[in-house]
């Protein structure tokens, strides 16, 4: 009998690039070791129902979406405009193509990160031929993002899976010695030492 497959799940949210993503680099490094901690790698992106209107993903037009409309609770405005939705979709498909080019793939879900991760963990638990090597996410700022991280951490505990939260590397304030030198405009921020 062959040993069980060990799957490492990487939950992507805003870090939708392959080239400069530290998690993908670490996975690549670990996979080249003789004793790597996983046999399979599963990157997952979930179109967030609380941010993006997902009713269009329901295949049967007679059925209602299981998620409420993605409107701001106070103002009632849509939380995602068409340009942001287009940018997000293009980023997801570009990442999927980049991963396919190197022999991997991206699982795309719709709903909540909690529901997606729970579904995957439950499916592997029922399979009984697969162990979860871990669930990795990148730390994000924001109340909803922190709630997602807490929910996934709780799910991992429930399913006895290791949870790792990576530091977001978009910016480190500690890198700036003199705060008065931080540019007020983004175009100048990229030039700030």
Show the residue positions of the predicted features.
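N-terminal beta-strand-loop-alpha-helix module at the start
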Residues: 1-104
């Amino acid at each position: 009998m062959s040993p069980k497959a060990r799957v490492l799940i990487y939950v992507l949210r805003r870090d939708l690039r392959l080239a400069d993503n530290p998690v993908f680099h670490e996975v690549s490094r670990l996979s080249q070791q003789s004793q790597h901690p996983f046999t399979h790698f599963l990157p997952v992106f979930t179109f967030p129902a609380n941010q993006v209107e997902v009713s269009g993903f329901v295949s049967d037009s007679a059925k209602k979406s299981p998620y409420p409309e993605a409107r701001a609770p106070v103002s009632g405005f849509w939380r995602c405009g068409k340009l942001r939705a287009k940018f997000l979709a293009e980023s997801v498909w570009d990442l999927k193509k980049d991963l396919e080019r190197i022999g991997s793939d991206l699982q795309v879900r719709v709903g909540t990160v909690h529901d997606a991760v729970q579904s995957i963990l439950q499916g592997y638990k029922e399979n009984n031929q697969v162990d979860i090597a871990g669930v990795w996410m990148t730390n994000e700022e924001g109340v909803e993002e922190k709630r997602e991280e807490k929910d996934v951490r709780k799910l991992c505990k429930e399913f006895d899976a290791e949870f790792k939260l990576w530091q977001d590397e978009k910016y480190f304030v500690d890198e700036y010695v003199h705060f008065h030198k931080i540019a007020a405009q983004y175009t100048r921020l990229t030039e700030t030492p």
